[in-house]
Amino acid sequence: MRKINLDLKNQSYDIRIGSDIINLSNVEKFVSNKEVLIVFDSAINGSRITQFKEMISKSTLKLELIEVDATEKNKSQKTLSKIHSILVENKFSRDCLVIGMGGGIVCDIAGFSAATYQRGVNFLLIPTTLLAQVDASVGGKTAINHPKGKNMIGAFHQPIGVIADTSFLQTLPEREISCGLSEMIKHGLINDINYFCWLEENIEQILRLEPKSIEEAIGKSIEIKTFYVKEDEKEANIRALLNFGHTFGHAIELIGEFKDYNHGEAVAIGMILALELSKRIGNISKQDCLRVRDLIEKAKIDTKIKNPINPADLYKGMMGDKKKKGDILNLVVLEELGNAKVSSGIDESLILEILNSSL
């Protein structure tokens, strides 16, 4: 088992990575003598939930569970209210613990329910998808969606621990593994060309979930993400670089009504568009773009446009981005492979030209 510590100004917690590490020795200190609510993903095998419940039940003061059908549609005020109702009706105190066990959607909504119950209670994350292990579970971003935008209602609220058990990945469909790889490729592109090169060399082993390769990749991605979180916990500055491809990607998800693309696919399309923008403003070469697209293809990430997208509609969706300042859109672009920056005030006509030629 590998352990990465995220040491912040007001809090420090460990992120554990390994196979079959959901055991009492790793969990008991969090649940002992606590009122515990487990928010779990309906996609998880029922026997694993039963085993986990039985394992911790003797250590807890009170134990409740709620199952969430993890769709973007259900990442909503309605689901949040259901979670809050269980906490209120069972008289959970401010000393309680919420456990989020599932993919990114469950991690986000479990975290936000903890952030907003009695002005903030503790939560533990057990991410069960590759995307959640390398991205959603790390850094304290919690949120639900609004009909007009993804993650528009949320809070920064750090977990007290993260347990990334790679054994959960063995039962995932290949599409879910590819979804996680999208964020991992992003980490290399914005921060570490050597990691990007390593992904190029090891992509087949990662897709096969070979233990050494997958754990090394998860660990490296988490190291990169924790670097940005340590430096800029509330995303006032360099943490925004983690949004490479996301301004385009979130708008694509919204236009597809959260049905046409999963998050990793939308981000991959967004990265391709951001690469084209980076090329057009003179930062990277055509060969760089082709190299990244080749890795995205080898990672088996589907970047086909499912239904026609109107560039003007996509641009309108991008203007709803949380990171814009007034009417000025901030976009993350690459200065070179492995190095990113935020670019402000890019001409609307250039963005629309890229969208028209690429979609």
Question: Predicted regions span which residues?
Answer:
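C-terminal charged capping/lid subdomain of soluble metabolic enzymes
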Residues: 2, 12, 283-359
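ATP/NTP phosphate-donor binding region
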Residues: 1-96
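Short glycine/serine/threonine-rich phosphate/pyrophosphate-binding segments
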Residues: 105-112, 133-134, 251
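A glycine/threonine-rich phosphate-anchoring loop and its flanking beta-alpha core
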Residues: 7, 112-205
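Structural motif
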Residues: 66, 100-101, 126
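Active-site segments that bind and position negatively charged phosphate/pyrophosphate groups
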Residues: 202-312
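Glycine-rich beta-strand-to-loop/alpha-helix junction loops that act as flexible
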Residues: 70-71, 101-103, 244-245
